[in-house]
Design a protein with these regions (language model features):
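Short Pro/Gly-enriched beta-strand edge/turn motifs at strand-loop
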Residues: 59-68, 72, 124, 131-132, ...
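C-terminal catalytic domain of Rieske-type non-heme iron oxygenases
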Residues: 5, 164-348
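A generic secondary-structure signal marking the coil-to-beta-strand transition
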Residues: 61, 75-77, 84, 147-149, ...
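Rieske [2Fe-2S] iron-sulfur-binding domain
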Residues: 5, 66-170
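N-terminal short leaders/motifs
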Residues: 9-45, 91, 95, 99-102, ...
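A short, structural micro-pattern
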Residues: 59, 136, 143-145, 269-271, ...
């Protein structure tokens, strides 16, 4: 089968066809102020409707605590989720255990207690917690998905039906992926983090150092079915000068506190970026605090990717650096949104 010159150009632009090299070259660099404005497309009502649909989905009362690989067998984690002290550690088999972070005896902070042979031993009076109910201390359901640790807090929302496991998006095989988890926190609520991620139109304007040539190919209608509730975006990741990596990505919200970006075409097809928002409580000024736990699970079938996997200790910090730069901006977006909502000045 032969192609005309026009057909060849169309095929070369098809995002489903990957070039031999992952990089592309922009014909010309468009100055930031000359790119197409997106404010008309980024309709507050449309974004708000997508947020409302996400908030209506079941979470099963599961909250992300942190990166699985960071929880070792020698020291516990201490976390505050929805104002509740939580402690998490690994037992002698390496299985995570979770429960209240306050010792039931006299209130010692269990996050400061050591783990000995899988047992958490309170450093005030030696109460030993193996993960079973002890002296008024009751364990909490906990889940390790290989990337993240989750804890289930049924007391937070008794209207939610508890689920046996968190609502997880499809992921590439972990043994064939590079995994990085970045965590930060800010003065906002979970809905502000999710709303930020359900606004893909801000990408090339707000993050010009990372994204160029962003086009929202399709956005969900306000009364769409679940299977159509996705934002599809063509975007190029900026490398240097006119050198870019063009991809197509789909943004979905599988549960109220999670937004997932799937790379569906282009370099890294099958890779995902999961953005999870965990409510922490309030700060000394009474402002809500929310943690962002963002997991990047990158994969590729290119031969060179195997080399990148071997360089995991170097790739991880680089991926975290990139996420940190983006979230410095996106947290400012989320905090501004929360401030405007709290003062009745938020549009829409």
């Amino acid at each position: 089968m032969s192609y005309s010159r026009k057909q060849k150009r169309m095929v070369s632009r098809d995002p489903a066809r990957r070039p031999r090299l992952p990089l592309g070259l922009r014909k010309r660099a468009v100055p930031w102020e000359h790119q197409r404005s997106t404010w008309r497309d980024a309709n507050p009502g449309l974004i708000g409707a997508a947020l409302s649909r996400a908030q209506a989905r079941p979470s099963g009362n599961w909250y992300v605590v942190g990166a699985s690989r960071h929880l070792n067998s020698t020291a516990p984690w201490g976390r505050t989720i929805t104002g509740r002290e939580i402690v998490v550690w690994r037992d002698a088999r390496g299985t995570p255990v979770a429960g209240p972070g306050q010792c039931p005896h006299l209130g010692a902070p269990l996050k400061d207690s050591p783990v000995r042979c899988g047992t958490l031993v309170c450093h005030w009076h030696g109460l030993a917690l193996s993960g079973a109910p002890t002296a008024g201390w009751e364990p909490l359901p906990v889940h390790d998905d290989g990337v993240l640790i989750w804890v289930r807090l049924d007391a937070v929302d008794d209207a939610q039906l508890p689920l046996d496991a968190p609502v997880l998006p499809p992921r590439p095989r972990l043994d064939r992926s590079l995994v990085s988890v970045y965590t930060t926190a800010g003065a906002c609520e979970t809905e502000d983090i999710v709303a930020n991620r359900l606004d893909p139109w801000h990408g090339a304007w707000f993050h010009p150092y990372s994204f160029v040539d962003l086009t929202v190919v399709s956005a969900p209608q306000r009364d769409c079915a679940d299977e159509d509730d996705a934002f599809v975006v063509d975007v190029s990741f900026k490398v240097a000068g006119r050198v870019v990596v063009p991809v197509r990505a789909t943004f979905t919200a599988p549960e109220p506190r999670t937004v997932v970006m799937h790379i569906t075409h282009g370099e890294g097809e099958g890779s995902v970026v999961e953005t999870h928002a965990t409510p922490l409580g309030t700060d000394a000024q009474g402002r809500p605090r929310t943690a962002v736990v963002e997991a990047v699970i990158a994969t590729s079938d290119r031969p060179g990717f195997r080399v990148a996997q071997l360089l995991r200790p170097l790739a991880g910090p680089l991926m975290n650096h990139t996420a940190g730069r983006l979230w410095r901006d996106d947290m400012a977006y989320a905090e501004r949104r929360r401030l405007l909502r709290s003062t009745g000045r938020f549009p829409g």
